[in-house]
Amino acid sequence: MPAVLDTPVAIRRTAMDLLARREHGRVELTRKLRQRGAPPELIEAALDRLVEEGLLSESRYLESFVSYRARSGYGPARIREELNQRGLQRADVERALKECGVNWQEKLQEVWQRKFAGELPVDARERARQGRFLSYRGYPLDMIGRLLSGRGGDD
């Protein structure tokens, strides 16, 4: 039987359980607690307290999310869009992408190498296919163009 979330203690316990599994953003944690039936005013108070105690941190969430998605082979545009959909501030998202320490050109090269075995496209159709794949993964078109023309990051 699911726990009844009608007291601050129960809401805090549930929020802590969710945070123990992985970092969450405030918007995401609020949504999950509401889905479990917690009243909005109690959620806000509980989350404010978690922020004060340093247990809920947007910057930690952004850092872990960007790192995880970059390791999974996604580019900055895709990660930016996913974070914007999660209701995070655009300035915070941009800062996290800048400070993550990921070399996006190297990541693009790794993803391309893994998917296409380093085979440069021989015709326009193959170039378009590879470009679409890399674009869908969230890499900028200028980087993709340099890579597929054989110039890589040597500009």
UniProtKB/Swiss-Prot annotation:
Q: Which GO terms describe its biological process?
A: regulation of DNA repair
Name its cellular compartments.
Cytoplasm
Please provide one cellular component term from the Gene Ontology annotations of this protein: cytoplasm
Identify the keywords attached in UniProt to this record, alphabetized.
Answer: Cytoplasm
Q: Which residues cross the membrane?
A: none
Task: One Pfam family, please name it.
Answer: RecX_HTH2
Q: Which InterPro entries match?
A: RecX_HTH_1st, RecX_HTH_2nd, RecX_HTH_3rd, Regulatory_RecX, WH-like_DNA-bd_sf
Indicate the principal place this protein occupies in or around the cell: cytoplasm
For this protein, the record's NCBIfam families field holds: PRK00117.2-1
What is this protein's function per UniProt?
Modulates RecA activity.
Which family is this sequence assigned to? Belongs to the RecX family.
What name does the UniProt record give this protein?
Answer: Regulatory protein RecX
Q: Which species expresses this protein natively?
A: Pseudomonas syringae pv. tomato (strain ATCC BAA-871 / DC3000)
The gene for this chain is recX
